[in-house]
A protein has these predicted regions:
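Active-site-facing alpha/beta catalytic cores
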Residues: 2-176
Length: 176
């Protein structure tokens, strides 16, 4: 079922890109959060329920959703499972055919993961984050003096920025 879902998502994204390109008369690049959302941004390191304080759920790549001490422990094997699942998804996307080109994207939340997948291109000698084609900053990760902005400034991938209602014009310009 998973392969069918991925194939369907790729076909929908490709169809939408074709419609948009035809209507606008310009090329359109289809980009999707195609390989899952395994990390969650959190404003607080912990959460409290009924007087019990535990680490926040940070996504399936980090810890479990169930509100128990065991589930909320960081588990490095989760990160490895996430990597394998994302790699399998990208293989399925590649197998859908060259005419259905969809690029993978995600928010660069887990900096250790992003750093581990950063490589220097042999020809250009420039670093690229190979965890996705397009990585982005979100509401909680786009602080100008933050580690996420510093990391994404250090790689040569195309980078997206999620700008919500709290963003100012000055912040947007500074991130450019």
């Amino acid at each position: 079922m998973r392969a069918d879902n991925i194939g369907n998502k790729v076909r929908v994204l490709s169809s939408m890109a074709t419609v948009m390109a035809d209507a606008a008369g310009v090329p359109v690049v289809a980009v999707g959060r195609i390989a899952g959302q395994y990390a969650k941004p959190r404003s607080r390191r912990t959460e409290t329920r009924d007087g019990v304080e535990l680490p926040s759920y940070r996504g399936d790549a980090v810890n479990g959703f169930e509100f128990t001490a065991r589930a909320r422990q960081h588990d490095p094997e989760r990160l490895e499972r996430m990597y394998r699942a994302a790699a399998e998804t990208l293989e399925l996307v590649a197998g859908t055919g060259r005419h259905l080109r969809v690029w993978a994207s995600h928010e660069a939340l887990l900096l250790d993961y992003e750093h581990s997948l950063t490589r220097v291109d042999e020809r250009s000698q420039l670093p690229y984050d190979l965890s996705g084609h397009l990585v982005w900053l979100g509401e909680r990760t786009r602080r100008l003096d933050g580690a996420h902005v510093a990391f994404l400034r250090s790689v040569h991938n195309p980078v997206g920025v999620k700008l919500g209602p709290s963003a100012t014009a000055q912040q947007a310009v500074a991130l450019a």
